[in-house]
Amino acid sequence: MDTIGLDLHKRESQLCILTEDGEVIERRLVTSRERFTAVLGGRPRARILLEASTESEWVARHLEALGHEVRSCGAELK
């Protein structure tokens, strides 16, 4: 299963995918349902980690509807 880190912002977000094969894919994308569907909708089920923010609730629900496993965390990891 791929692991995806998603740094959400109001207009544009950063995406980092670590594939099962160890490949790292980094992208910037507009923060919208349409772009998340276009970029992540066709990918196999992945584990996605989101930083908790004002955008994270609707994004998490949308990504779960696309079939992904979504976790949200605070900005500070200890």
Please name every model-derived segment.
Residues M1-K78:
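Phosphate- and other anionic-substrate recognition elements at nucleic-acid/protein interfaces
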